[in-house]
Each structure stands twice: as structure tokens, then as C-alpha cells.
Amino acid sequence: MASNMRAGSSSTPLVSLVRMTRCDLCDETHQSHLPTLRQLYEEAFPHSERRPWSDLEQLIGEQGAYHFFLLEHPELGVVGFVTLWHFDDFYYGEHFAILPHLRNHRLGEQTLQTIQEYIGREPLYFEVEPETLSEIAGRRINYYERNGFQVVKRDYLQPPYHREEQGVPLYIMSSELGERDFIERVCQTLVDRVYPHF
């Protein structure tokens, strides 16, 4: 069943992480959110930066390193989702999105705080589009920097999610600067464990 983790003081309602499991895919309560979350997933990320939804559901069912979390707010209900991979000594945030009508209400910041409490002292890594790609990409990098992340690798090529596509040039951002060898190992782990091999 879904497990719940909330961060923050009692006076500040923060976003909770509710992990989806194989059972939740068939549970009416959580199943009712799936169409909205699927639409958010497919609208928030370009085709080249997301796996097919059926593959995502399969990963949820496997209960391995992949964690799909509903983001729940005590007053607003489900506000988005985040997907995390947990490896031996770091976490990787694959996808993170807030529902469009709830953006700019500090829910993303609250979610990052909750994630940091959930993962403890292990570093967290994200892929982001280069700021040269668009104004939105630049704002996203600034947003993560304001929340304690920094670009640690600029010459990273995200492997393709789909057989017919090429890799996507992205940056790697992290909650810790880290040694170069460690960052290279993180990138190799992503290539080996996260992305499909065609």
C-alpha cells in the first residue's frame, strides 16, 4: 500500500510523498488520480524526455529502485508527482511536476524540502535542459539553484527513451557538488540502470 511521508512543522502544511505500489494501481482511491497524473506527465515533459506510460506503470509494479510518489497537500489534495530512483549511495529525480493551476504557490519548494528529509544525507541528482534551450529552461535552473542545487555536469547526453530517437543534451544538477569521479559514476549508473537499451 501507499506509504506516506510528510515534512515540516505543524504550522506549515507541506507536501507529503505518497509512494504508489503495485496494489495502488488497482486501488480505487489512487487509481482515480492516474488519468490526471498521466496527462500532467505527458504535457510537462516532451516525448524525448519521458518513457511510455505503460513502462512507468510496470516500474511502479516492480517495487525496485524506482519510486513513484503522489504529491499530496493537506488542503489541496494531490498536487503533482515526483519519480525517484534510489541507488546505493544517491537518489536520482527522474520526473517532477506540479499541476499547472497550482504552480507558483511554493509547492515545488515544499516538495524539494520533503524529498530532502525523505532521502536524508544522500545526494540528489536531476537532469535539466540547458538554459540556452529556452527561457523556461533558464528559469528552471535558477529555481533549483535557489533551492540549493547546482549544475555539476554540462556535457551529459541523456540516452533516448524511444528506439527511433537520439540522445538529448542535458545538464546534471545536484544537492552536493561531489567529486568528479563520483559524478561520472552517477551518470554511468543512469545510463546503465534508468534508460532502456535498444
Residue ranges of model-derived segments:
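Conserved active-site alpha-helix within GNAT-family acetyltransferase domains
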Residues: P130-R154
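Conserved GNAT acetyl-CoA-binding A-motif
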Residues: I119-E135
